[in-house]
Structures are given as C-alpha cells and as structure tokens.
C-alpha cells in the first residue's frame, strides 16, 4: 500500500473525528471501536482498495483499532519503540503480509491517529476549560465519553478481543517492545480489563 493511500486513510480518520467532535473526548477501547465502526460505515469515502479491504476484514480492522492499548506501562518500553509510536505503527503496516494483517495494521494506524487528535487537542482543551490536573483530568476525559456511548461499544470491544487474533498477535509480538511485562502478558492483562 502506498504512502498516498496511508495518508488518505489517516486523513479520513481525521475527517471523521472532526465530523464527530463530541466523540473525541475519550479514547477507551469502546470509543476506539465506536470510531472504527464509523470508519467501516463510511467506506465510500475511502479509496476503493482500502474500502474493499476493510469490508472484507472488518474484525481485523477493529482489533487493530484497540490493539495499540494492549501494552501496559508503555513508558518502560525502549525509547521510540512503545506501542503508540508512529514508527512502530508503520513497522506493523510494512510487516503485514496478507490482507487480514493489512486491515489490522490500518486499524492500528487509525488508533494512533485518533489518539493523536485526543492527546494533542481535545484532552488539553478540556483540561484547560475545566481546570483539571493533567494526571487526573487526562484519564477522566479519556473515559468520560464512553459513558455517553452506553454499553454497546464496550461490549463489542470485549467480544472482539475474544475472537481468534493469533496472526495479528504474532505480528505484534515480533514488533512491540516488552514493558514491565512481555507482550503476551500485557495482552492477557488488557483482555482482562476490557
């Protein structure tokens, strides 16, 4: 997939976030599934090759959209090699050897795009207008929106992680740096929290 197509996908994700600004106040697994679902329902806006890929492998795309959060204590990963690094996201995309893995990688990149908007615009704005401390306020604003979504998307995130994602997990295991825990242990902990 060319850089232009990746840029188009990220541009569409940013467009959807701008079109749905009320959704950008929280980036929990349920919210990432909500945003990923919005992309899947807007495939007519995507280049046809990407749209066809996401329609063929929606669960791989959605799993990618939450997989970047599977690492616990990412600050203990090697510099520039933590799960939310764009270099890591692009490494995952480049290493994707088949269509399901490419859909997964695009979901992973969509997750990073959504977090970039949240962490660089929406959360700081909310911290400013509410006089919250960054340590408490950040988590508060990241989790607040999911309460407005109801249980549908958090339940969908939970059901999603129970599916077989062995190939995607194997890809992550080869790229992600361990934190305090191995990537396998991080994933087990994450699945227990969703």
Q: Residue ranges of each PLM-predicted region?
A:
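A mid-sequence, solvent-exposed acidic-amphipathic segment
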Residues: 182-194
């Amino acid at each position: 997939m060319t850089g232009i197509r990746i840029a188009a996908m990220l541009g569409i994700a940013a467009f959807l976030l701008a079109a749905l600004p009320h959704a950008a106040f929280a980036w929990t697994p349920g919210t990432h599934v909500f945003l990923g679902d919005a992309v899947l329902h807007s495939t007519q806006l995507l280049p046809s090759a990407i749209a066809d890929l996401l329609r063929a492998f929606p669960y791989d795309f959605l799993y990618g959209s939450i997989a970047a959060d599977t690492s616990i204590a990412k600050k203990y990963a090697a510099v520039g090699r933590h799960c939310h690094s764009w270099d890591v996201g692009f490494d995952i995309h480049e290493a994707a050897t088949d269509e399901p893995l490419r859909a997964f990688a695009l979901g992973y990149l969509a997750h990073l795009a959504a977090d970039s908007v949240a962490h660089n615009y929406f959360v700081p704005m909310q911290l400013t207008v509410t006089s919250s401390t960054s340590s408490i306020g950040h988590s508060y604003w990241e989790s607040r929106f999911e309460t407005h979504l109801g249980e549908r998307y958090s339940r969908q995130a939970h059901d999603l992680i129970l599916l077989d994602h062995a190939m995607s997990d194997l890809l992550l295991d080869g790229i992600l740096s361990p934190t305090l825990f191995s990537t396998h242990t991080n994933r087990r902990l994450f699945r227990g929290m969703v």
